[in-house]
Amino acid sequence: MITNNWTYHGEPFVEPGEYYGFVYCITNLLSGKRYIGKKFFWSVKRKQVNKVRKRYKVESDWKEYWSSSEDLKEDVRTIGPKHFKREILHLCKNKGTTNYLEAKEQFLREVLESNDWYNSWIQVKVHRSHYKP
């Protein structure tokens, strides 16, 4: 689809640096409908080499990612990615903080209470020790 059009504080965002993940808002510029979600920059893969299991970090598909919402992805396919704005709201240094801030944004914006949002679910399980702002 599109290589990368994520913005952070109004500027193009291209390199994750030391960050683990981000919380984002995607806006349909024609209808105004939005989606709040999260995405991790990295994942850990395992590979067996000479009977030894090794772990290594690989970059995710975050540059091309359009959310887990099937309705949103269908709209992107139908009207095209140029009619959407992809904004990074929070850059996070660990998984727990990413999960917490996604849920916080979803509750603060009341995404389940209006049809102005693509969001259909809020799922989170975060322990206090995992949240490190």
PLM-predicted stretches and their roles:
Residues 1-133:
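Structure-specific nucleic-acid interaction/processing domains
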